[in-house]
Amino acid sequence: MEKFSNIAQLKDSGLKVTGPRLKILDLFETHAEEHLSAEDVYRILLEEGVEIGVATIYRVLTQFEQAGILQRHHFETGKAVYELDKGDHHDHIVCVKCGEVTEFHNPEIEALQDKIAEENGYRIVDHALYMYGVCSDCQAKGKR
C-alpha cells in the first residue's frame, strides 16, 4: 500500500496521522503475510534504523486493533501477535516447535461449524480456529 493510502486509512479510522503510526502501518504492509508481536515490530524497526519506544508500539497496536486495521491472535506462545485485517476470514495452523503460522480457509470446516451451531441453537457471529501441530520442516529435522 502506498503512503498516501496509509494516511487515508489512518484518517478514515479516526486516528491522527503520526510518524510512529505511519511507520508501524508501513511495516505491517511490508510484512503482510506475517504475524508479528510487539517485540517483532520493535526489532524490525530498530534494524531499519527507526527508534520507537516499546510502550508506543503497544499503544499503536492496540489502537490499530480497535480501529479494525489489525487483528490480534493469541497462539500457544502466550504472546499476542498481530496481522493486517484484510477483511477475509481464515483459520490458522501453528507449529508447536518453531512457531510458524500457516493460514487456510476450508469451506467444509466452515459449513460444519455452522451446522454444529445451528444444531445447538446458535448462530455464529464470529469464530477463531487454531490448530497446533509440527510443520514439515520440523518433522524433517526430527523435532517431533
From Swiss-Prot:
GO terms for cellular component: cytosol. Keywords: Cytoplasm, DNA-binding, Iron, Metal-binding, Repressor, Transcription, Transcription regulation, Zinc. Pfam families: FUR. InterPro entries: FUR, Fur_C, WH-like_DNA-bd_sf, WH_DNA-bd_sf. It comes from the Bacteria. The keyword Phosphoprotein does not apply. GO terms for biological process: negative regulation of DNA-templated transcription; negative regulation of siderophore biosynthetic process. One of its GO terms (molecular function) is DNA-binding transcription factor activity. Fe cation binds at H89, D91, E110, H127. It is found in: Cytoplasm. Residues 1-86 are annotated as: DNA-binding. Residues 87-144 are annotated as: Dimerization. The keyword Ligase does not apply. Zn(2+) binds at H35, E83, H92, C95, C98, E103. Belongs to the Fur family. PANTHER family: FERRIC UPTAKE REGULATION PROTEIN, ZINC UPTAKE REGULATION PROTEIN. Homodimer. Acts as a global negative controlling element, employing Fe(2+) as a cofactor to bind the operator of the repressed genes. Regulates the expression of the fbp protein. This is Ferric uptake regulation protein. It comes from Neisseria meningitidis serogroup C.
